[in-house]
């Protein structure tokens, strides 16, 4: 894990190394100051020697300035290294997510991925910044201050060897308890993100069903769970500060009592024992040693908080995409023919029954195919195997006579345009959204594609035309308008295969007919697969596939199915009756 995260330093590697070096310089100056202070008092003030006073005062000033300089440099380099590390980590995670298949996304959930890319990375950034500063400062301060105090008085320094193990025991008791709580907190953040995303995306539904109070109470329940867990963690961590203060004041009390006796016994003579200046230095070292332990405990707490985010981010970084391009992949799609050869598919190995079973189909290039079936009959699942959004569990899917697993994924998907059942538009202008299909498309090509999709008629009605701004998710256009824009975007790819997954359900029958007519006249060489609920949308298709419970119930054109399939006739008659009513 450490090796993988270390790769995220990249260009900030040396910056991350310079910060601890500067921190060591700062600590060295801080440890030197009490020694200079002792000499200032013992050999300057006590002996009324102004030359020594001025000399030691200058040394103190230089040490203080050097400490300030090293401290500022360390903080600056640490900040740059931590920020750069977080940027690279977020970059690597985001790029990994882009390679995920649908099944990888389903494994984590979108809300969890958002949490990991935002709050988890922020927590890791803070922990890393503290590590390269405090994790160096505290041990160095502890070691140098202890060595300096041992040089002054080994007898007085023995008090540290009692206090330090006691504080270590307190810390070791706190960390496991706190870790479990923080691990639970970050999982709860995923739930919080899910609630917020669902509420914001579905705010119109929430308001139409007057469910604001219910949503607020749901949000408050999760927020309270996070609050309660943080309170528990803080209550446990609160033990740390009193324990530290007890140790500090106990050490100072012991050093004051024993040290004062030693100063009196030596007559304030360094050659015979302890001096007043050295005793004051011992007080400073006591504070430095025990405060370094206090800061070290904070580092442990921060690292403990970061362990859960580290594990969660590591899961993203090491998750292997289920679908990858093979070596020596095919980089050209010959034509738009499609073959399903004894195809079965399960969304997971734990699924009780397959979503698709024993599917055998041949679709000639350039044909128009209608796909019909009840809700849950696996119509969408069938077409998602063509651009290899999922891999068939059994059998093979061929495009242009070649198994889809042999294609380069980018090449395959570039030749298969798919308008999903759930249409998605991104914030930006209509032009920017359309150019997702073809970044180099000219304005004339945009207009032509929109005319084929019957979108030009409403776009030109907007004051800003094709420069009209689309809100996130396309919230400022109607469902039918959104569908037509998505169809136009797909057409701009100039694909060999075009898949419309119930993508005209929100448009009227006249517009639907106009779109189908444009397809027939303008893109005859493109294989068109149209999933629809209305037989009227697909009855002119060359082939109609009727799906039932993951099986192909029947295949043929409209006239053939009307004669041979009772199931198809039943659907047709019910829809005809509904239209007459």
Residue ranges of model-derived segments:
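Transmembrane helix-loop-helix hairpins at lipid-water interfaces of multipass membrane proteins
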Residues: 10, 16-73, 77, 150-155, ...
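ABC-type nucleotide-binding domain
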Residues: 332-581
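Short intracellular "coupling" helices and adjacent cytoplasmic loop segments at the cytosolic face
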Residues: 47, 83, 91-115, 119-121, ...
